Amino acid sequence: MENTVLNLDSDVIHACEAIFQPIRLVYTHAQTPDVSGVSMLEKIQQILPQIAKNAESAEQLRRVPDENIKLLKEIGLHRAFQPKVYGGLEMSLPDFANCIVTLAGACAGTAWAFSLLCTHSHQIAMFSKQLQDEIWLKDPDATASSSIAPFGKVEEVEGGIILNGDYGWSSGCDHAEYAIVGFNRFDADGNKIYSFGVIPRSDYEIVDNWYAQAIKSSGSKMLKLVNVFIPEYRISKAKDMMEGKSAGFGLYPDSKIFYTPYRPYFASGFSAVSLGIAERMIEAFKEKQRNRVRAYTGANVGLATPALMRIAESTHQVAAARALLEKTWEDHRIHGLNHQYPNKETLAFWRTNQAYAVKMCIEAVDRLMAAAGATSFMDNSELQRLFRDAHMTGAHAYTDYDVCAQILGRELMGMEPDPTMV
C-alpha cells in the first residue's frame, strides 16, 4: 500500500470540525419563530457578539452589565415564562434552555443571572392572581431575583408575617424589581412549613458582597430585610407549588407550561449554563490548538495525538450531556403539553439528570484545560474563565451530584425521600 501523508493544517482540522458540527447545531431546528419569523435563538445569536465582548468587563463589574440586560430585554427573553395574559411568551423549556446554552458560551454570569430572572416568572405565576396583577399590570417587564433558603426570622402577625434576615446568593438582584425569599413558618403542632414570599425592591437593601472567583458577573449579592411585612396573598407553601396546589395553579387552563412544577424550570438554567460553557470550551480549545507549538522545541503540540484524543473524548462527553438534557427538557415539555403532572420518580430524574450533565461538562472542561498550556491560565485568557465558571456551575446546591445520586438512589429503591436533601 502507498503511504498516505496527513496534512495537519487541513485534514485534521476539517475532521475535528466534522466532530463539532453536531454539537453546535443539534437543537436549532426546534425553535419556534415569532410573528416576524425569527426565533428567540436567532435573536440571541444576533446579540451574542456584543455579549461576548462585554464578558471581561462584566467580571470586573461583578454583575450583569446594563447593556446586556437592555439587549436581552429588547428581544423579549425576560418574558419567556410570563403568562401570555400579561404579554408573556410561555416558551417551551427546550426552546428556552437552548437559548441559555448559547448565551452561556458568551458570558456565563449573564446567562446564569438572566435565566433566573426568567424562570422566576414561572414561579410567580404559581402565586395568587392578586400578586400577579400587582406585579405585571403595573410593569409587564418586571422580573424577580430570589434567595430561597430559609435564612430569615419570621414573626406571625395579622394578615401575614414580619420577616428579618440576610438573604445571600440573589443572582441578578441589581436588575430585578422584586425578590422571592424563602422562610419557615410553623403550624399549630410546631411543624415547619417551608414557604416563599414575594417582596418589592423598596422593601430590602442590596448588600454588595459578591466577590467570587467564578460566575463573577452574576451579581449574586445579599439582600438585607429589616421588619419587612409580607401579606398572605404574596406567600405560598413550597410543597403546594410542587404538588399543583398553590393559589395560581389552574389559572391558565390553555397553557402548555403551567401544569408542571416551578422547580424544574427554576433549576434548568444551571445545567444549561454548564453545557454552554463546555461547548464553548471545545471551540475555544480548538481555536487555541490550531497553531500551538512547544516554546523550547517549536514542535506542533496543538495537533499532536494526545490533544486530538482529549478533544475527541471531551466532545463525546459534552454531546452525551446535551443528549441527556435534551431528553429531560423534551420530557418536561410533553408533560406540560398533556397537562400531565409528573410523578415522584420523574421529578427525581429531572432533578438528578441535570446534576449528572453538569458533572460530565466539568469533566470535559477539565480534560481540555489540563492540556491547554500555561498561557491558558493568564487573566486575559477565555479558557481560564470558562474553566472557573464550569466548576461554579457544579457548586450550587441543586447541581451537587453527591446529593443527587442519593436522591435518585433512594427513589429507585423505593425509599422515602431524605428531608435533609432538597
Swiss-Prot record:
Pathway(s): Aromatic compound metabolism; 4-hydroxyphenylacetate degradation; pyruvate and succinate semialdehyde from 4-hydroxyphenylacetate: step 1/7
Enzyme Commission (EC) number: 1.14.14.9
Q: Please name the NCBIfam families in this protein's record.
A: HphnlacHdxOX
**Tagged with keyword Nucleotide-binding:** yes
Q: Which family is it part of?
A: Belongs to the HpaH/HsaA monooxygenase family.
Top-level class of the enzyme under EC nomenclature:
oxidoreductase
The effect annotated for S146A is: Decrease in rate constant for hydroxylation by 6-fold
Amino-acid positions noted as binding FMN in the UniProt annotation, renumbered to this chain: W112, S146, S147, I148, W169, S170, S171, R292, Y296, A374, T375, H396, A397
* The gene coding this protein: C2-hpah
Entry keyword set: Aromatic hydrocarbons catabolism, FAD, Flavoprotein, FMN, Monooxygenase, Nucleotide-binding, Oxidoreductase
Activity regulation text: Inhibited by flavin concentrations greater than 15 uM. Also inhibited by excess p-hydroxyphenylacetate (HPA).
Any Pfam family matching the protein = Acyl-CoA_dh_2
> What protein name applies here?
p-hydroxyphenylacetate 3-hydroxylase, oxygenase component
Its Gene Ontology cellular component terms are: cytoplasm
Q: What outcome follows a substitution of H396N?
A: Decrease in rate constant for the formation of the reaction intermediate by 30-fold. Denatured above pH 10
pH dependence remark: Optimum pH is 6-10.
How does this protein assemble?
Homotetramer. The p-hydroxyphenylacetate 3-hydroxylase (HpaH) is composed of an oxygenase component C2 and a reductase component C1.
- InterPro entries with a match to the protein in the record: Acyl-CoA_dehydrogenase, Acyl-CoA_DH_C, Acyl-CoA_Oxase/DH_mid-dom_sf, AcylCo_DH-like_C, AcylCoA_DH/ox_N, AcylCoA_DH/ox_N_sf, AcylCoA_DH/oxidase_NM_dom_sf
A single Gene Ontology MF term assigned here is: acyl-CoA dehydrogenase activity
